[in-house]
C-alpha cells in the first residue's frame, strides 16, 4: 500500500507509538513524495503490530526503533484505507475492528464472532484466532472484503485442510454469508490456502496467498507464497 505521509509517519514513530514512548517531541517534517508502509509481526512477538517503511519497496527501514506500535493489538496485521479515508485492520484477541486516521493512534470496536463462525454450517471450522482475518476496501463496489482461513476437517492436525473464506460488508454491521474465496481448477483444485491478502492494481484484483499443501503433494508450490489474479 502506498502512502504520501511516510515522512510524517517516520517522525511520529519516534515519540508516539508504543508504551515505551520517548520524552519530548521532535520537529515534524513536511510531507514527502511518498513511500510504502509494511505492517507486520515478528517471531519474538507473534501477533503484535510493527511498522517498516520503504521508498522503493525493496529497501526497508524499521520504524519506532523496532518497538511495538500498539500493545493492545493482537492479530495478523493487514491495514486497508477505507471509505472515509481512515485506516482499518482486524484484531483477533479479542476479535475487534481497529481504526486510525493517522496510522499512529488506534481505537477499537468489538466484532461479532458469528461473522466467522457462521461458516461452521458449511463444514468449515474456525481455528484459534479465527484464521488470521485480512481485509480490503474496494472503491468500485463500496464494499469491504474480509477473508480468513478455516479448516474443512477438524480432525486434521496439519494445514492441509485449510481453505480461505470471505464475507462482504459496507458498514461493519451487516455481512454476507461466508463463502469460499478461491475456486481453482486442475492441479490447484484442492489447494490448502491461508493468509490471503487482496489488493487491486490498475483495475486488476491480486491475491497474495500461502499454498499450505505438503511439498510431497505439490512439489513445485507446496509451502510457498503465490500470487493469483
Across the structure, where does each feature detected by a protein language model lie?
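Beta-rich carbohydrate-recognition and catalytic domains
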Residues: 23-130, 136-195, 199-229
Amino acid at each position: 500500500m502506498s502512502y504520501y505521509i511516510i515522512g510524517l509517519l517516520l517522525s511520529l514513530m519516534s515519540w508516539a507509538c508504543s508504551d515505551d514512548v520517548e520524552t519530548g517531541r521532535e520537529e515534524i517534517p513536511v510531507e514527502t513524495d511518498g513511500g510504502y508502509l509494511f505492517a507486520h509481526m515478528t517471531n519474538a512477538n507473534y501477533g503484535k503490530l510493527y511498522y517498516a517503511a520503504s521508498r522503493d519497496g525493496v529497501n526497508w527501514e524499521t520504524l519506532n526503533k523496532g518497538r511495538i506500535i500498539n500493545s493492545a493489538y493482537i492479530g495478523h496485521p493487514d491495514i486497508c484505507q477505507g471509505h472515509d479515508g481512515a485506516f482499518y485492520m482486524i484484531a483477533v484477541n479479542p476479535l475487534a475492528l481497529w481504526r486510525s486516521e493517522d496510522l499512529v493512534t488506534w481505537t477499537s470496536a468489538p466484532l461479532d464472532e458469528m461473522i466467522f463462525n457462521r461458516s461452521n454450517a458449511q463444514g468449515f471450522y474456525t481455528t484459534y484466532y479465527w484464521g488470521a482475518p485480512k481485509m480490503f476496501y474496494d472503491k468500485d463496489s463500496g464494499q469491504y472484503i474480509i477473508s480468513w482461513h478455516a479448516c474443512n476437517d477438524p480432525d486434521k492436525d496439519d494445514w492441509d485442510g485449510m481453505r480461505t473464506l470471505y464475507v462482504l460488508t459496507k458498514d461493519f454491521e451487516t455481512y454476507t454469508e461466508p463463502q469460499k474465496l478461491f475456486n481453482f481448477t486442475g492441479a490447484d483444485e484442492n489447494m490448502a490456502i491461508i493468509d490471503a491478502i487482496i489488493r487491486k492494481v490498475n483495475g486488476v484484483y491480486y491475491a497474495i496467498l500461502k499454498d499450505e499443501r505438503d511439498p510431497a503433494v505439490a512439489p513445485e508450490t507446496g509451502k510457498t507464497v503465490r500470487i493469483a489474479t
